[in-house]
Regions:
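Short coil/turn segments at secondary-structure boundaries
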Residues: 35, 52-55, 72, 105-107, ...
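Glycine-rich nucleophile elbow surrounding the catalytic serine of serine-hydrolase chemistry
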Residues: 99-104
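Helix-loop module immediately N-terminal to the HCX5R catalytic loop
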Residues: 58-91
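PTP/DSP superfamily signal
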Residues: 2-3, 79-90, 106-187
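Glycine-rich, flexible N-terminal cofactor/catalytic loop recognition
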Residues: 8-50, 54
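Beta-strand cores of modular interaction/reader domains in eukaryotic scaffold and signaling proteins
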Residues: 16, 22-23, 39-42, 56-61, ...
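Residues that form ligand- and interface-recognition hot spots within folded domains
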Residues: 25-27, 44-49, 61-66, 95-97, ...
Length: 187
């Protein structure tokens, strides 16, 4: 969540979430940037990427759409990441900009495999890659996942503006940014 300049800068980076798990968008992907990895997880529906032969590739063909059901893919992605971790590998998971689809899988992985709450997992990933912002539909699915895992939830979907749903963990950031913009523009 931030200005278009920061989004542009951050979307061209590969973010290290764990020593074995990295998150990115398409922009920084080159044969050279892929050399350190043993596996890539491609979360772009229309992109069948040619990958260097040393890479294991998992393609999760999903759209960044609130109606996209991620539940059939949770365990496939988590198992792939864990297998790579156990074998000393490094996984790069990416989507178009590294903001919604791939970020959702990384946050959900931390919830499931590292026993973090949704709020804590989201905040941790956001501290590393501040542009993450899973869409509301993906947040709803992570809230359901958290409920299944822990019989409680730490994030709620709120409607602060008539008809607009926002995760409460995101709303304060949005509100603060809007107020900063108003203050800067003197309005």
């Amino acid at each position: 969540m931030t200005t278009s300049k920061v989004i542009s800068q951050d979307s061209s980076k590969i973010s290290k979430i764990r020593p074995f798990l990295y998150l990115s968008g398409l922009a920084p992907l080159t044969p050279t940037s892929l050399k350190p990895f043993t596996c890539i997880i491609n979360c772009v529906a229309g992109l069948r990427q040619f990958a260097p032969s040393h890479l294991s590739v998992l393609h999760i063909p999903i759209e960044d759409d609130e109606g996209t059901d991620l539940s059939p893919y949770w365990h496939i992605v988590f198992r792939k990441i864990d297998d790579q971790k156990k074998n000393g590998g490094k996984v790069l998971i990416f989507c178009g900009m590294g903001i919604s689809r791939s970020a959702t899988f990384v946050v959900a992985y931390l919830m499931c495999m590292e026993k973090m709450t949704l709020r804590d997992a989201y905040k941790e990933v956001q501290n590393i890659r501040n542009i993450i912002c899973p869409n509301v539909g993906f947040f709803k699915q992570m809230i359901e996942l958290e409920e299944k895992l822990y019989n409680q939830t730490t994030v709620k979907i709120i409607t602060p503006i008539n008809g607009i749903e926002v995760p409460d963990v995101v709303w304060k950031e949005l509100y603060d940014e809007m107020m900063d913009d108003i203050d800067k523009n003197g309005s």
